[in-house]
Amino acid sequence: FEALCHTCTLFGSPILAGKVRIPDLDVVEHTYGGEMEVRDGVGIDRDRGKAVDGVKFDYEVVPGDTAFHVSLSAENPDPVELGLLAAGVRELQRGNVPVGGKTTRGLGSCVLEGLSVDNADLSSPAELSEYLTGRGEEGDGMEVDDPDAFLDDCIKQLFAQ
C-alpha cells in the first residue's frame, strides 16, 4: 500500500477502504419547512450546446436555508492524512466545497458552522481503556477545546513533513 497516495489511503481507492466515514446527514428540523422546491430543467444536446425539443424535466431541491447535522470520523489517520482532512474541513468552513448534484448550476453551496472536534489517541492505553469502557462519549474529555486551532495545527503538520 506504500504506492498509494495519501488521498487514496484517507478516502479509499479501488483496492483499499478509506479511513473516513461520513454517515447520512440529518436535517436540522427548525430550518426545514417540510416542502421540497421543484425546479424546471431541459435536456441539452452536448454537441450543439442547444436545448433538445421535448426533453423537459423537473427536479426537486432542498430549500436553500436548510441546515444539516454532519458527522465525520477518521480511523487511524497519520499526520499527513489528518492535515489533508483538516484542510478539507477548513474549506467547508469557508464555503468553498459545493456538495450534491447540479453544483455547476449554483446548487449545493454550503458552509460548515458550529465545528466541534473529538480527538482520541487510541494508541494510548489509558485513552483506549476509557473509550472501550464506555467513557468515550460526550463529556468524556476527548473534545478539543479550540477546534480551529486544532485544524491549524494539523494543517501546519503537512508542511513540517
Language-model features, listed with the residues they occupy:
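Small/polar/charged residue-enriched interaction surfaces, especially the RNA/DNA-contacting tracks
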Residues: 1-161
